[in-house]
Amino acid sequence: MGWEYAQVHLKYTIPFGVVLAAVYRPLMSRLDVFKLVFLITVSFFWVVKGLEANSCRLLLFLPCMLILRGVLLRLTNADSPWDSYLIKNRIWTYPPGVVVGLTAWDIPAEELFFFVIQTFNTSLLYMILSKPTFHPIYLSKKTGWGKIAGQILFASAIIFGLVSVSSGGEGMYMGLILIWACPFLLFLWSISYQFIVNLPWTNTALPIALPTLYLWVVDTFALRRGTWSITSGTKYGVVLWDGLEIEEAVFFLLTNTLIVFGLIACDNNLAILDTFPEHFPRTKGVPSLLTIIRTLILPKEKYDEERIQGLVSAVALLRKKSRSFYLASGTFEGRLRIDLIRLYAFCRAADDLVDEAPSVDDSRASIEKLRKFLDLAYEENQEEPSQRLREYVTSSIPEMFHMALLQLPTYYLPKQPLDDLLKGFDTDLLFDRKSGAFPIETTEDLDIYGSRVAGTVAELCNHLILYHTPEAVPEDIQREVVASGQEMGIALQYVNIARDIKTDAEIDRVYLPLSWLKEAQLTPEDVIQQPHGPTIEALRHKLLDRAFEKYNMAKGAIDKLPSEGKGPIRVAVESYMEIGRVLREKGPTMKKGRATVPKMRRIRVAWSALNK
């Protein structure tokens, strides 16, 4: 009996897992918990009970389990007998004084735990790196040569492995590794290769490379110390570096590839499920295995390419116009994230359609076109835009905005907030420096304006959260959440105005109420001419005081949101209010005339918000 192998876990694998778990815990969703707990629990069940026949029947009835099987393989009965075979035939050996002595199928308990901790660590690393990724935009109908090339590669590896095992000798261990891992890699590649090659390298190569390199180093220490060893005559004798056999290097590379490919396949199926509601009606919470199977067998020819391209356009717009919102949207999941992106893309497109018009008259015409669009969309009251609505948009709206309008989820959003948003645009067009027209006369006017341009968006976001949540939320709580969202939106708009006094002055707009200016013995022209100084700073602080007053009144309702929206909304709110806190401090970091929050401070704020 010994503790040397256990110390490998205590020194290297467990601390790594603890750090990853601590980093990802605030972002952990029900679906993430399901993936981890389900994989490890079911794997242990199979290992402890040794239900080889039952696991085979599960795979026959549930093909989607093969996706998970790639992650679980080292813990399933396809793996445990394989490990047992290696140990019984002394391909792998463990000196008697390095393990505690507990075994299953002659496999030391420490080795079984290693299978668990590797899956846990690599899975968490993948989840951390892929969290910001918006998976639906990586779906594609196209089938290229890459699929066949990958299939040939993995099939060739299987054949090479079979030949090596049948020949015995020095290629035995490498052959066993290849015939154990490559059939599942072939399967996972065949069903998800487009996703694998289309995703950013930070979602594919990086979560494979980092744990592989880490385990190569750990394995080197263990092999040098004799914690475990590979028997001569079953290995090639080639080392990647001193102390690391080539077979061990390939083994860890393939196991981490299995885990990551399996998780990518899961995300591929979830993206299909979330992106195509015409094939998969409204779903809430963790999807059933039967539903996942249906996504697996859906022909790519049935993908709605227009919907995919609409989401691609929406993401491109947000990355250009509001990267912070796009990144914040990564804390949401599934169809809720899709609809929030579609909603915000519409708001940005509508704003650009009005602001970028060549004249005030053209801007007013754009607002009327948007009103007509909303009237038609809500008159038809259907999920997918009709041919009539499409014809109106294509004939009246510039092409770059078509997708943003046609993908607005009007079917389950109220119309009034969108109408009010357009009224806010109307207010913006009333500013006229030449005639002395400045429409924000009183505090109440500013509240109304803030409610229209920001409170409406917050209200619509809350409607989407309540629509998509699997939780039952009482109607009185729903009303409170929506009303508080309106107030919070006004608070955020106050911060926005406080930040942009100089920027707005450059386009001859002054959103400070005329009543406030009169008390300070200023005119709008004074602000336009000199948008800084002690008096302006005093007015800025007055805006911020009112912003934080409304924020403090409304923030309690965030805790009453469903769990899917609580943390992400808190991050969005706190990140924006932090701009107000920076403005209150001396010497804010300025960028293009605006106060900005330093990057590390933004990270701390988001982390704190998620951990509340």
Curated annotation (Swiss-Prot):
Residues 275-612 are annotated as: Phytoene synthase. The keyword Protein biosynthesis does not apply. GO terms for molecular function: 15-cis-phytoene synthase activity; geranylgeranyl diphosphate synthase activity; intramolecular lyase activity; lycopene beta cyclase activity; squalene synthase [NAD(P)H] activity. GO terms for biological process: carotene biosynthetic process; carotenoid biosynthetic process. It catalyses: all-trans-lycopene = gamma-carotene; gamma-carotene = all-trans-beta-carotene; 2 (2E,6E,10E)-geranylgeranyl diphosphate = 15-cis-phytoene + 2 diphosphate. It comes from the Eukaryota. Bifunctional enzyme; part of the car gene cluster that mediates the biosynthesis of neurosporaxanthin, a carboxylic apocarotenoid acting as an essential protective pigments and leading to orange pigmentation. CarAR catalyzes the first step of the pathway by converting geranylgeranyl diphosphate to phytoene, as well as the later cyclization step that transforms the carB product lycopene into gamma-carotene. CarAR also converts part of gamma-carotene into beta-carotene. Neurosporaxanthin is synthesized from geranyl-geranyl pyrophosphate (GGPP) through several enzymatic activities. Induction: Induced by light. It is found in: Membrane. The chain crosses the membrane at residues 3-23, 31-51, 112-130, 148-168, 171-191, 203-223, 246-266. This is Bifunctional lycopene cyclase/phytoene synthase.
